[in-house]
Amino acid sequence: MSKSQSTNNQHNNGGNVLELRNIQQKYFDTKTRKDSVVFDNFNLAVEDYPGIGQFVVIMGRSGCGKSTILRYWTGLQKPTSGEVFVDGKPLAENQSIPMVFQQYSSLEWFSVLDNVALPLTLKGVSKKQAREHAMEMIKVVGLEGHENKFAKIPQLSGGQLQRVAIARSLVANPNMLVLDEPYGALDGFTRAKMQFFMLDLFQKSEIANLNPTVILVTHDPREAVLLGNDIYIMDANPGRIIKHIKPDLPDKRDKSIRKQPRF
């Protein structure tokens, strides 16, 4: 990744990098024939720490609105009322934040290389440049040698396809990335490997220099503590934050972290 690219995606200095303000969310429940309240005057502010990336984890039981929060910030859903801010500014109609879902999503008739290059080509980057930058990101996520394979099973495993999705989300150098239970569909062994892959990835200089903010939704408390600098625990009816935790663990972590008594 070129230095000129990485400097285009810096957070504001201080303040909140992501914020939800006075959010109301209702929908009509066809079973009860009444309005159901998801959020009632809900507020959440994720602080910006200039010069470092951060991993924010949102946990909570089903129905508390975790994925809805992600959809607000990515522009996939609007609240009934309230304000959504990104980098201190109202979320714009044409603004986009990349999102990786539980079920990996790829264009199966495209190669891995062309899947990863797609966000750049959609932005008008030449095919040659897009492929060059895509190849750099493919190396970062450990898929070098697979770039010419079709992005589908059985040519790639489920874990490899999630790496393709992550590489595609990062290739345009975003300063934010949203992950909605990205490992939920994987078996336990692959899930553990992907957790450490993500930990290693965001400590690599190619990614860390972008100082990204990553928002992860998970049900797994061990995953939350392993990856998160900030952990928000939610409850439902209506959705609300009941606890905010900053794990007493070093920002730089590796596999040995799970052997520490504090973990």
Predicted region positions:
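Hydrophobic anchor residue at the start of the ABC signature
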Residues: 166
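Conserved catalytic motifs of ABC-family nucleotide-binding domains
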Residues: 173
